[in-house]
Amino acid sequence: YSFQVGMRSYIFDLGYKGNLSWGRWKMGAEVIRHQLLPQNVEISGNLANYQSDTQRQNAMETSAYLQYCQPLGEKLLMELGTRASGYHCQKSYYRVMPHLKFDYNLSPSAKLNLNLGIRNQYLFQTGFSSAGLPTEFWFAADADHRPQYAYHVALQGEFWFAEKEYRLSVETYYKWLKHQMENSSNMFDILFSSYSFDGSLLHGKG
């Protein structure tokens, strides 16, 4: 038996980002147009002949952020901000993502920082995790796939040694993940069964 398998995919982004600083304030805006082709499978040969009907996705994403830094003493700095975003691909989604950060200088060679916030993402990356092949691809949130987001808290320590020639960074974090997706199919599903991109996706949280 002989056969050829093609799994074509691509992502193309075109956008603009602008930033402005004024004293302790920072602000900015961004607009991005995403053009994606999720995994488009083609099989030819005497084992099977198959071509998926994966459709190209066009998405538009806009966002704006505002950030403020406030010293709280000689060693402590607070950073407070928020990002608002809008997105459209078959359906429109809007999100507000606040964040809070504290930086504390333990000494000239040691620093701690604490991060809390919400993060949101409109693009997903998945693939055949068991294939051992470069099969990773991107696809966009749409009417059937809601954007993923996470609540997170992280504590990080940075330490410098030998007159700051060496740096050690240690971090511990916890995330509450929502609307996660993973591809549960593999190469054998494509070759020996009816493969469906939407049917192969697992939805969950973590």
Where are these regions (language model features)?
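Face-selective signature of the C-terminal outer-membrane beta-barrel domain
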Residues: 1-92, 105, 169
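Short coil turns and loop connectors of transmembrane beta-barrels in diderm outer membranes
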Residues: 21-22, 72-78, 108-109, 151, ...
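Outer membrane beta-barrel strand-and-loop segments of large Gram-negative receptors
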Residues: 5-15, 53-65, 163-206
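Surface-exposed extracellular loop regions of Gram-negative outer-membrane beta-barrel proteins
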Residues: 37-44, 90, 108-153, 172-199
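Residue-level signature of outer-membrane beta-barrel architecture
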Residues: 16-20, 68-70, 94, 102-105, ...
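Membrane-embedded beta-strands of outer-membrane beta-barrel proteins
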Residues: 10-14, 64-66, 98-100, 143, ...
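Membrane-embedded beta-strand positions of outer-membrane beta-barrel proteins
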Residues: 27-29, 80-82, 100, 114-116, ...
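Membrane-spanning beta-strands of outer-membrane beta-barrel proteins
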Residues: 7-9, 59-61, 93-95, 138, ...
